[in-house]
Curated annotation (Swiss-Prot):
Main localization category: cytoplasm
Statement: the UniProt record of this protein carries the keyword Cell division: no
Phosphothreonine: residues bearing it: T677
UniProt name for this protein: mRNA-decapping enzyme subunit 2
Length: 970
């Protein structure tokens, strides 16, 4: 039988018995580390005291109330072994109290939802009100300590409310207090402490009232007075944020109400995509009906009306895109698809204008144009495109693709090409919107009209600037009426200088005229995109650089303003003349005249030539394109104006050349003076006389305005160009053909790049390169030049007749028949006879030597030598550099060259020509044909600028073929 157990301490009245029980429970059996210090042992004494107060005294109310000090003294007195320290108990308790004050305290300042009230607690042993708080335990963080203490004292869990960044921290009497700020706690919560004899009261206090009556009322507060200011600031900030959020939400709601935006009107993106697909399917079904001829007559009439409205509308309109879809196809385009019911017609409204107007395609000949504002940048990787895309069978399992037909590539209309698929939805086109300044109707009017109205030209800024680079000689057929206004001498100079614009591309790029049409179209597509991406400022800079290059190419009779400005920076003329031939050969004959520019200027010239090559290659598409002829004529006009500007800069200030050369020195240079020849002086004397003959103004031509250019600026430039040049073309032609090539350049100075010069470049060097020879003790020989306008006119007529024959389809040449019909053809055929044999150069010393024997035995010399031809041949002979130049004939250059063109047209035996090594003295025979001598002289000039071992046959052509190719060049 078991005995009923009772509580050990129930009805116990002996204090010693109770103390013995507590001593065993809390002190004797504790770990040794907890007894290692006085403070740690007193913590166990404190826990035993709390147990006595919380439990034993409640069971035995008659027991005395014991504080920590009296309780510790009774324990030590009952068991002295537990106290092994040499310190008294009261002193140990004071030390223990100081230690407890150093322990950090963590608590919470709890506010209600309106931020108007704060929650405070009052302890059982204190009459002051403060935050719920507690001491941090060992290895416990701040957040966990705050949550634990608040839950013990008020029974509320702050896990979902606490923010580790919102707190107030203070140090009071060496004790750290960290109070976290909590808001949004409900006032209706039933707060109840979970510990005994620690919290007496829990109440909500009005924060505003506390802040006013803190120091006046009888209620005591702890920690609140020291934290009142930061609490007030935090509350103000929280109220402001709350008010701003409410204000923003209120304003948003009111704005939506004003705009009529409600949540019900918002469309789901998935639903919107589905609606778009349904619309596309419905459009495709309508297209099938149109292809089958089921469109009602009223709808067809509406389509035709819209089509005519788009063609006739000329002014710019800007309107937002309409949600309605344009008609998928016009009735005129449904015919190719009428027989095939499985074909979906194209749905691109942007191609309607081009498909319905085939003449526009024929006129433009596939030239690129700026896209319309409503067109998406669709890419087409096929080499050619068809104005009507290839039919694609429908796929009803997949969503329709209304954008499958991209922008047609109009470079080639030979065959169809499969369009690349494009998955974007179609861009809607406004029903009432017309095309802007790049309208096809306006473009067609420009192409068909030879002289459009100046007002129309000034109001548009076409983007077809890619075709304004280079010069096409075929465009002269469209401009014969305008060229008659030029003087005969000026037109002769222009005809002789035209090959220079196209022969530069021979060494760097292949001629695109021999390429297939597809290849040309691909090149134009890539270069058109590069050109459109470049700025107008770069294009204008390139044009200025080309102008400076043309100035250097001009005949060096008088120094230009550009050379005068750079007179302090150039090299001595003697040194420049020695090294200039190498510089010109290394740059692939880019700089024809004597090089005076700095290396930076030469690099700019090379870059400008590269840009010219890029755009010049794009114009060789077809000879019969009206659009290309129109653009080429404008470009030819620009080239002529630039040449006139060049001559104006060279003769704007008729200052004596000797005066300008006297101060043309650099630091460390010995002053010297170059003595000009009598030929240059005679030419300078004829400037005033010849300037009065070329005063006829040219008829203005059509000029496509560039981006950023206005008609007023174009008119000013035109006036400047019209009044630019009055220099005689006969003088320039004579100076061009007269300049000898120096033989002082040693063979080791020749650039290896000269071997890569094409035949065109060699002949152009012969005709246009300025003299770089160094006069040595030259004697002044007086001679004068007279003007013969009648001979120049006759020569101009023959050259124009020659050019017309060249532009015709090329046929096998018959020398006898052509020589009887056209004197210019006679000279060409005579030069062509010399094509059978080429002679390599040999090096015989420091200076370049010419071949010692050149024989031709293909015909007999049966005509006498013309006197005037002999005189012109003497001009063209290389002059001995040690004895000065030979005397020049008094005959006019145009008359002399005309006599050569009228000279013997039969083949003759070409005798040996012996050249002296030091001065290229030519031993001529009176029985030689003057035309053959002219050819030999030109070949000798060509050999003077090439490498010593350069063989003319290395390129497969001789000097005569090279000259013939220049005269035939387009």
């Amino acid at each position: 039988m078991s005995l009923p157990l009772r509580h050990a301490l129930e009805n116990v009245t002996s204090v010693d018995r109770i103390l013995e029980d507590l001593l065993v429970r809390f002190i004797i059996n504790c770990p040794n580390e907890d007894l290692s210090s006085v403070e740690r042992e007193l913590f166990h004494f404190e826990e035993a005291s709390w147990f006595y107060t919380d439990f034993i005294k409640l069971m035995n109310p008659t027991l005395p109330s014991l504080k920590i000090k009296s309780f510790a003294q009774l324990i030590i007195k009952l068991c002295p072994l537990v106290w092994k320290w040499d310190i008294r108990v009261d002193e140990a308790l004071q030390q223990f109290s100081k230690y407890k004050k150093s322990i950090p305290v963590r608590g919470a300042a709890i506010f209600n939802e309106n931020l108007s009230k704060i929650l405070l607690v009052q302890g059982t042993e204190s009459d002051s009100w403060s935050f719920p708080r507690g001491k941090i335990s060992k290895d416990e963080n701040d957040i966990d300590c705050c949550i634990r203490e608040v839950k013990e004292e008020i029974g509320f869990d702050l896990t979902d409310y606490i923010d580790d960044n919102q707190f107030i921290e203070r140090n009071i009497q060496g004790k750290n207090y960290k109070i976290f700020l909590i808001s949004g706690v409900s006032e209706v919560f039933n707060f109840k402490p979970q510990v005994r004899n620690e919290i007496d009261k829990i109440e909500w206090f009005d924060f505003k009232k506390i802040s006013k009556t803190m120091y006046k009322s009888n209620i005591k507060y702890y920690l609140i007075n020291s934290m009142m200011r930061p609490l007030s600031m935090w509350l103000r900030h929280q109220r402001q944020i709350k008010n701003e959020d409410q204000l923003k939400s209120y304003a948003e709601e009111q704005l939506k109400l004003l705009l009529g935006i409600t949540k019900e009107e918002q469309i789901d993106p998935g639903r919107e995509l589905l609606n778009m697909l349904h619309t596309a399917v419905q459009a495709n079904s309508n297209n099938n009906a149109v292809s089958n001829g089921q469109v009602p007559s009223s709808q067809e009439h509406q389509h035709l009306k819209e089509q005519s409205g788009e063609h006739n509308q000329q002014k710019d309109q800007q309107s937002s895109f309409s949600s309605q879809q344009q008609p998928s196809i016009f009735p005129s385009l449904s015919e190719p698809f009428a027989n095939n019911k499985n074909v979906i017609p194209p749905t691109m409204p942007m191609a309607n204008v081009f498909m319905s107007n085939p003449q526009l395609f024929a006129t433009m000949n596939g030239q690129p144009f700026a896209p319309f504002p409503f067109m998406l940048p669709l890419t087409n990787n096929s080499n050619s495109a068809n104005p009507i895309p290839t039919p694609v069978p429908p796929n009803f399992n997949a969503p329709p693709n209304p954008m499958a037909f991209g922008v047609p590539n109009m470079h080639n209309l030979s065959g169809p090409a499969v369009s690349q698929p494009f998955s974007l939805p179609p861009a809607p086109l406004p029903r009432d919107s017309g095309y802007s300044s790049s309208s096809p109707g306006q473009l067609l009017d420009i192409l068909n009209s030879k002289k459009p109205d100046s007002n129309v030209q000034s109001s548009k800024k076409p983007k077809l600037k890619i075709l304004q680079r280079g010069t096409d000689l075929n465009s002269i057929k469209q401009n014969n009426n305008d060229e008659t206004a030029h003087s005969n001498s000026q037109a002769l100079l222009d005809l002789l200088k035209k090959p220079t614009s196209s022969q530069k591309t021979h060494a760097s790029k292949p001629d695109t005229s021999f390429l297939p049409n597809d290849s040309v179209s691909g090149i134009q597509d890539a270069e058109y995109e590069d050109f459109e991406s470049s700025s107008d400022e770069e294009v204008e800079t390139a044009r200025d650089e080309r102008t400076s290059l043309n100035v250097d190419i001009g005949v060096n009779v008088m120094p230009s303003e550009k050379d005068s400005r750079r007179s302090q920076k150039e090299k001595p003329r003697s040194d420049a003349n020695k090294t200039n031939l190498n510089a010109s050969a290394e740059s692939n004959s880019v700089e024809w005249g004597p090089g005076k520019s700095s290396p930076s200027t030469q690099s700019k010239q090379n870059s400008s030539v590269g840009m010219q090559n890029k755009y010049r290659q794009e114009i060789h598409i077809g000879d019969s394109d009206a659009y290309e002829v129109f653009e080429s004529s404008s470009d030819e006009e620009d080239g002529k104006k630039l040449e006139e500007l060049e001559q104006t800069q060279g003769n704007s200030k008729l200052i004596s050349q000797d005066i300008l050369k006297e101060n043309n020195f650099q630091d460390g240079e010995v002053p010297h003076r170059d003595m000009p020849t009598e030929s240059n002086k005679s030419i300078n004397e004829t400037v005033g006389l010849s300037s009065t003959t070329n005063t006829v103004k040219k008829v203005p031509k059509v000029k496509i305005l560039k981006r950023g250019e206005t008609f007023a600026s174009l008119a000013n430039d035109k006036k400047a160009f019209d009044s630019s040049s009055n220099v005689s073309s006969s003088k320039d032609l004579l100076q061009m053909l007269r300049n000898p090539i120096s033989s002082t350049v040693s063979s080791n100075q020749q650039s290896p790049k000269s071997q890569h010069l094409s035949g065109d470049e060699e002949i152009m060097m012969m005709l246009k390169r300025n003299s770089v020879s160094k006069p040595q003790n030259s004697e002044e020989n007086a001679s004068t030049s007279s003007i013969n306008d009648a001979n120049a006119s006759e020569l101009l007529g023959m050259l124009k007749q020659k050019e017309k024959d060249i532009t015709a389809p090329k046929q096998p040449y018959n020398v006898d028949s052509y020589s009887q019909k056209n004197p210019a053809k006679g000279l060409l055929n005579i030069l062509k006879k010399n094509n059978s044999t080429g002679y390599p150069r040999t090096e015989g010393g420091p200076s370049s030597e010419m071949p010692t024997s050149m024989k031709r035995n293909d015909a007999t010399n049966n005509q006498e030598l013309d006197k005037n031809s002999t005189e012109l041949l003497n001009y063209l002979k290389p002059k001995p550099l040690n004895d000065g130049y030979e005397n020049i004939s008094n005959k006019d250059s145009s008359h002399e060259l005309l006599n050569i063109l009228h000279g013997n047209k039969n083949s003759s035996t070409f005798n040996n020509n012996v050249y002296a090594t030091d001065g290229y003295s030519l031993a001529s025979d009176n029985n030689e044909n003057s035309s053959n001598k002219l050819l030999n002289m030109l070949q000798n000039r060509s050999s003077a600028i090439n490498e010593p071992n350069f063989d003319v046959r290395s390129n497969g052509t001789s000097g005569s073929n090279e000259l013939l190719s220049i005269l035939h060049r387009k």
